[in-house]
């Protein structure tokens, strides 16, 4: 992986390092008999129809126009596929955009397509940098379904009388609201308690100042149905891996017992 410093115009304080996957594929192993494990196959770029790996379906977008809202970015990138969430980094004091966003797609293929199409494109006079975000292994802290109980004001501008979907600051106009989540009968979920998405694989590159995520209390676009699908697929993958490990362990002890007899 290559470490590079990202400079954003008009943002002198942003001196955080970001990490990305190299665009050059790793050389094949020298031993031809070595067969890659199923987990390695599923984590390879463009890894077929395997399960979702967040580090392969999350885009890192920088040099965005500071006036673009969360909803604007969602509208732009949803043209390439189903977007599960958009997170815009904001200054912790002024609450203004820092020109950086993470866009989580349901499909890694859609994420790759969006990265190819949007990278180096000029938007509002600024040249975008778009790439697949890298893994720093901190999914549980940042990839969360956020639920805001205060529905009296807009989480984009802070004003009352409208929601962020219809915020006047949205340059691309109002956005259709996602369908309300289905209640599952559990009291805590009905009360709106935030539920973590349990990723056992990689997370987006979040080696940025953590306060921006911890204090980001305004704009967060969450497609609830997409989140449900992601959680279900991840749970199925985890169960598959658990069963494979169990089978391998049983086979190993079976061989040992034969030798002893």
Swiss-Prot record:
UniProt keyword annotation of NAD present: no
Gene Ontology terms: biological process: developmental process; mRNA splicing, via spliceosome; regulation of cell division
Tissue expression from the record: Ubiquitous. Abundantly expressed in the shoot apical neristem.
Record's keyword annotation contains Metal-binding: yes
Residue span(s) of domain RRM: 57-135
Taxonomy, superkingdom: Eukaryota
Organism of derivation: Arabidopsis thaliana
Null mutant phenotype: Embryo lethal when homozygous, and defective for seed maturation when heterozygous.
Gene3D superfamilies reported in the protein's UniProt record: 3.30.70.330, Zinc finger, CCHC-type
Subunit structure: Component of the U11/U12 snRNPs that are part of the U12-type spliceosome.
InterPro entries cross-referenced by the UniProt entry: Nucleotide-bd_a/b_plait_sf, RBD_domain_sf, RRM_dom, ZCRB1, ZCRB1_RRM, Znf_CCHC, Znf_CCHC_sf
GO cellular component: nucleus; U12-type spliceosomal complex
UniProt protein name: U11/U12 small nuclear ribonucleoprotein 31 kDa protein
Origin organism lineage: Eukaryota, Viridiplantae, Streptophyta, Embryophyta, Tracheophyta
Protein keywords: Metal-binding, mRNA processing, mRNA splicing, Nucleus, Ribonucleoprotein, RNA-binding, Spliceosome, Zinc, Zinc-finger
A GO molecular-function annotation: zinc ion binding
Location relative to the cell: Nucleus
Region (Disordered): 18-51, 165-261
Basic and acidic residues composition bias: residue spans: 226-235
CCHC-type zinc finger span: 153-169
